[in-house]
Amino acid sequence: MSLVCAIALIFTLFPQIEAKALEHTQTAPLYIYSKDCPEEYMEYALNTVGDFLGSSEYNDITDPWIGTPFTFANPESNIYYFPIYDNGKIAYTFRVYKTYTGDITGILSEALVNDLNEFSAQTNAENPLKIYCKDDDSIIFSKEDSPSSLSFENSANQSEAGMDGSFVVIECKMEDKIEKTVRPRGGDSYINLFPNINYIDVQSGDNYWCVGYVAAAILNYTKIDVTITPKEFMKLYGITDPKKGTYLRNLYYYLIADYVKGTGKFSSSALSFLDMAIEIEEGRPVAISMRNIKNTSTEEGVGNHAVVVRGLDSYRAHFSIWNPWYRFYESIVTLDSYTPAISSTREYSYSRDGRTVYGIKNLA
């Protein structure tokens, strides 16, 4: 998944949130072209993000503030990103959207953080940022002579954003102080597995080898095979073309081979929350395949995406996952709905036609 950088223009303050006195001054406001955020999304974010930040996973966040939300410049865009500031700088984004069931959910991660911090110093009221997501899930940061001058390269969206008047330019800035949810004594059970993924050569989603990356991360963490790479794993199953994937069950077949001592189990369905929690608490990362519910293919594996469940906050029932498209982890409210950060066309569900490899012993 490539990132293409360039930027866009105009001005209007976001009208729905009243700014408060700040304890710390942010490095620079970010002017961005967006639709106004629905009130229910703002209420959800304000009521939820403190639950995430109250976990020991985020102990390094000492002065959190939530910022003005924005969305992509696509006409159909309905995922809103709330910048989460720490000591005046964007540290995370909290993306909020409605699931296929109509419920609101949120995901906290470092998605877009580096780009937003970089562009904030380059934007102003007359020269705002415009973010456009293409069908191939690439992002364009655009800077043009006018907000309407960027012609969409996406054949499905030939009309230009904002022509209906729904888009304005907002000043994205620190808005409300976040109060971290205080855990009762002994109530914070946050467990992180394989905290360092830098040894994995992440390809940022530019191929179909998500199972290979998930397998390599888990196998290296468990010391089952400390040298295997995603490429080597995929080659075991005759795959060298980056446009071809493999089934999650092949990780299971690898695990139960004689030289791996028979560790691992496979399920053609999703684990319950309790069973998933037991795996994490026992130090066993779980590989899952999530179904793209917007993909209508009936062929097994088509439209699926593999991620690793590698952390658990048992107090608020939040999981931490690693999507092999990214070099960071994500805290997620529910595994029933997952929309990647750089997408407007995909929604994955683990509970609907999910696959699971679990019981993976740590042999270190």
What annotation goes with each model-predicted range?
Residues 2-3, 211, 302:
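Active-site-proximal structural scaffolding
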Residues 2-12:
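Bacterial N-terminal signal peptides
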Residues 10-27:
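Sec-dependent signal peptide cleavage junction
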Residues 22-24, 43-47, 51-52, 59, ...:
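Active-site-adjacent structural segments surrounding the nucleophilic cysteine of cysteine proteases
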Residues 24-91, 97-115, 232-364:
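Conserved active-site-adjacent core of cysteine acyl-enzyme catalytic domains
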